[in-house]
Design a protein with these regions (language model features):
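Contiguous beta-strand/loop segments that form the cofactor/metal-binding neighborhood of enzyme cores
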Residues: 2-3, 195-283, 311-322, 343, ...
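Conserved SAM-binding strand-loop segment of SAM-dependent methyltransferases
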Residues: 60-67
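Beta-strand-loop-alpha-helix segment that lines the small-molecule cofactor/substrate pocket
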Residues: 73, 77-78, 84-85, 89-136, ...
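Predominantly a Rossmann-like dinucleotide-binding segment in NAD(P)-dependent oxidoreductases
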Residues: 135-231, 350
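N-terminal Rossmann-like dinucleotide-binding module
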Residues: 2-59, 377
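Glycine- and charged-residue-rich phosphate/anionic-cofactor binding loop of Rossmann-like
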Residues: 40-42, 297-301, 319-336
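Hydrophobic residues in well-ordered beta-strands that form the structural core
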Residues: 65, 103-104, 129-131, 252, ...
Length: 380
């Protein structure tokens, strides 16, 4: 499955954007999308048009309305799909059919069949797909990935990642959906960690995992529903091994069962050194290197932007104009989804499960890549 990138777009200048979904996460995106000079947000849409209107007025977006308003807007080239996960594929497919490139908030899809169908539809139409997470484009992870690709740790051999918390029900006012099909610690947080591992090692070849849940019922701890019980449908502790096409391997823990919170732990070990990466749920953070013979970590200053959500949309827009491949592709997101579904299948079967898809590591951003710089001038 390819991502169309062979020729520059026929349009010139700033890339037009339409946002579908005016919920809470839209604020995090619009904080950046409305300030990147290479983008122009023309419209925000939502099933609840009053929500779209309020968000448009908050950010000075000239137009708002229902979903069709964004899909049919003549100046919109990229749809930023911030709908609920269950609607991601439906909205993305409608956008592709309308001739729009699509950036989707994670998850790319809830299952292999619909995700693969979306990839095929976009490929046939010559449409680009991009998907969160784009945190690996931030200064922290880009600095670490450049060190790996430059050979500073030798040949990458192993990876370890950890995400452990007591679970979100103590602070989240409506946490039940995080314990249902398509969520849990694996599908909620796994994309950040597994995407980082794919960037470090390349495609995942096979996985093995075990999982468990300590409780069938949990209790909401805050907000208007405090004290209400809800059913836990998915494993809340997952321990997964992955082997990559390169021969490297990794071990990851994703848990809502730990009284002690430990998150953002990512270490990559090579033949010459171990690299400690920043939290893959963030765009910045320290990078530390421990070479053979060292007695302590050496901190490597992070270089590059750490603007936050929307950097993947901007990279997609600039790549669209240049006719080059963007980095946070739909293929990458589908491969991570495929790996997570395979992990779930391994928990059920007790065996290794092959990951059929592939997604090579993306090219690093140039060190002088600057979101705040206008690069797409009219007529250029």
């Amino acid at each position: 499955m390819s991502t169309p990138a062979s020729t520059p777009s026929l349009r010139k200048g700033r890339v037009g954007v339409g946002v579908v979904g005016a919920g809470n996460i839209s604020k995090q995106y619009l904080d950046n999308l409305t300030t990147f000079p290479d983008l122009k947000v023309h419209v925000i849409a939502d099933l609840f048009e009053e929500a779209a209107k309020a968000r448009a007025q908050e950010y000075g977006i000239p137009e708002w309305g229902g979903v069709e308003k964004a899909l049919n807007h003549p100046d919109v080239e990229i749809i930023v799909n911030l709908t609920i996960p269950a609607a991601h594929v439906e909205v993305a497919t409608a956008a592709v059919n309308a001739g729009k490139h699509v950036w989707t908030e994670k998850p790319f899809s809830l299952d292999r069949e619909s995700g693969l169908g979306l990839l095929k539809t976009a490929d046939t139409a010559g449409i680009r797909l991009g998907c969160a997470p784009d945190t690996f484009l931030g200064a922290g992870l880009q600095t670490a990935l450049r060190l790996i690709q430059r050979g500073d740790i030798g040949t990458p051999l192993t990876g370890m990642t950890t995400f452990q918390t007591p679970g979100p029900e103590s602070w989240h006012p409506n946490p039940a959906f995080l314990f249902q099909y398509g969520a849990g610690p694996l599908f909620d947080m796994g994309p950040y960690y597994l995407t980082t591992l794919v960037q470090a090692f390349g495609s995942i070849r096979k996985v093995a995992a075990v999982g468990s849940k300590a409780k069938d019922v949990r209790v909401i701890g805050s907000g208007p529903k405090a004290g209400e019980e809800f059913t836990v449908e998915v494993p809340t502790h997952v321990s997964a091994m992955a082997q990559f096409e390169s021969g490297a391997s990794s071990h990851s823990v994703f848990s809502f069962e730990s009284p002690r919170t430990r998150m953002g732990f990512v270490e990559i070990t090579g033949t010459e050194a171990t690299l400690s990466l920043p939290d893959p749920n963030n765009f910045d953070g320290d990078v530390r290197l421990w070479r053979a013979g060292d007695e302590d970590w050496t901190t490597i200053p992070a270089t590059g932007p750490a603007n936050g959500r929307g950097m993947g949309v901007l990279d997609m827009a600039r790549s669209l104009r240049a006719g080059t491949l963007h980095r946070a592709t739909g293929n990458l997101a589908y491969h991570v989804l495929d790996a997570m579904v395979s992990i779930s299948e391994s928990m059920d079967s007790g065996t290794f499960v092959d990951v059929e898809s592939s997604a090579p590591a993306s090219a690093p951003l140039p060190e002088d890549w600057a979101p705040e710089t206008l690069t797409l001038e009219e007529g250029a």
